[in-house]
Amino acid sequence: YWSDSDWNAGDLSRDTQTNPRPFRISSFSTMDTIYHKLINNFNSLEKIILTGHSAGSQMVVRYASGGRAELSLTQTGVDFIYIPTNTPSFLYFDDNRVLDEGVGVFDFGPTDCINASQYKYGMENLNQYMGETGSEQIIEKHKNTKIIYLIGQYDFGGQTSTCARMVQGYSRLIRTHIYFSYLGYFYGDEVYDNSQMIEIPGASHDFNMIVSSE
């Protein structure tokens, strides 16, 4: 079992004095197992889509970058697609964050938030699973992975006292727009061969509104 948020970062399961466990496992390792089981048991499988909403979408975006099952299953011909929806925070690949979120074209530079680059918001102090994947592989995989970012037009929430999240933008809506722009800043426009962002008209922080949209 995991705490309220450890699971969406791929952290190890818990082993406490109150609830002892014989071993610990990363939540991302469980996803690896599920991927392999699906492909091994369904020979005609053509596509796997992993989606999640809010806290779940934080797992989707990080597993899309650092998950290892896909790397060992490329020869199967299965198409892997990730669809995070209304995401509260993202994984950045360097120390730069948006300088002014109130402008139409975003620019990026250093931030005063000392925790901004700590995992799960950045690439410093990666947990065990992500560390085993490695920063170079994480960065390369994210660029080459099919990811569709969905965000509600009216998802204005997500404020927190955590500066590492707030320097990504004031709300979930603006964070998604900023991050999508950041991808082009970091990788160049070729990243958009695999990455898309769609703002869902009329939707707020509501999964049903997102998935029932056209």
Label each PLM-derived region with a short phrase.
Residues 17-23, 165-171, 203-204, 208:
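Active-site rim elements
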Residues 43-54:
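Alpha/beta-hydrolase fold nucleophile elbow
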Residues 57-70:
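Short glycine-enriched nucleophile-adjacent loop
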Residues 76-185, 189:
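The feature captures the conserved acid-bearing segment of alpha/beta-hydrolase catalytic domains
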Residues 2-42:
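Alpha/beta-hydrolase active-site loop
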Residues 54-55, 86:
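Catalytic nucleophile serine of serine hydrolases
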Residues 150, 180-214:
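C-terminal catalytic histidine-bearing segment of alpha/beta-hydrolase fold enzymes
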Residues 27-34, 56-59, 175-179:
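Stable alpha-helical elements in mature extracytoplasmic
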